[in-house]
Amino acid sequence: KRSGYNNIITVEKKKLNLIFQEKVIAFLKKKKPKCIFLAAAKVGGIFSNKKFKANYIYENLMIQTNIIHGAYKANIKNLIFLGSSCIYPKLCKQPIKESYFLSGKLEETNDAYAIAKIAGIKMCQSYNFQYKTNYKCLMPTNTFGPNDNYHKLNSHFIPALLRKIYQIERSNNNIIKIWGDGSPRREIIYSEDIADACIFFMNKKTKHSLINIGTGNDFRIKEYVSQFLKILLPKRKIKIVYDRSKPNGTPRKVLDVSLAKKYGWTAKTSIKEAVFKTYDEYKYSQK
């Protein structure tokens, strides 16, 4: 809306379950949007991805297949599909270029989710080839922001960390426990920057259908923990305990965002600003 778009079509899951193809196609034919931003997906952290692999591959395949094919059936030529940096091999050269796609073995903990996303990318590319559509695939790095998933077992690293910090703030507890040994390096980006990228690339003519979206900067998990504690609880002395019995996941994952920059897009929000905005929204939601 801030960008001047007023005719925005959204629908709640209880009113339209994206698993059901006939209903999705009927909805798209009725509404006839000029463009689609496909961000709907089943997502979660390491624990959830390891335990519910069938759910992750089935639900994500169904959601994206129904919307991408539905867009074609409804003659909607423009679509942005949001993938994930987990589509890239577990052990590949860093920073990760788009050309590394399908060049090696995936991270085992979330391979079901990754394979579903890979299928979505190939589907967009195939429809572009056969039907001359304009379906673009943006691969965001680890995203966080307001209205994130803070579930105890299936949240991603950043919302899980913010939830733990909030619990400490409300108690006399001065210990925070973190999965793994804190050594993996991760890149993070604010959700509003992802939204900005979606609008930018929807309006931008590109030769590429697969584009990385990130900051190009990464830090160790332990560095994020220390930084967030300093930002949000500057007067508290918190002991950080790492649970080495839990998996680390991929050792390092930072995206090469030179292609996005070449087209004229860069992330704008600092980590500090993003953390404050996200944490304030989470605290407000808990009242």
Residue ranges and their predicted role:
Residues R2, Q167-K287:
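C-terminal substrate-binding subdomain of Rossmann-fold SDR/epimerase-dehydratase oxidoreductases
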Residues G83-S84, I121-N149, P159, R170-K177:
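Conserved beta-loop-beta element that borders a ligand/cofactor-binding pocket
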Residues I9-E22:
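Rossmann-fold cofactor-recognition segment
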Residues T65-N110, K136:
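Conserved Rossmann-fold NAD(P)-dependent oxidoreductase catalytic core, especially the SDR/UDP-sugar
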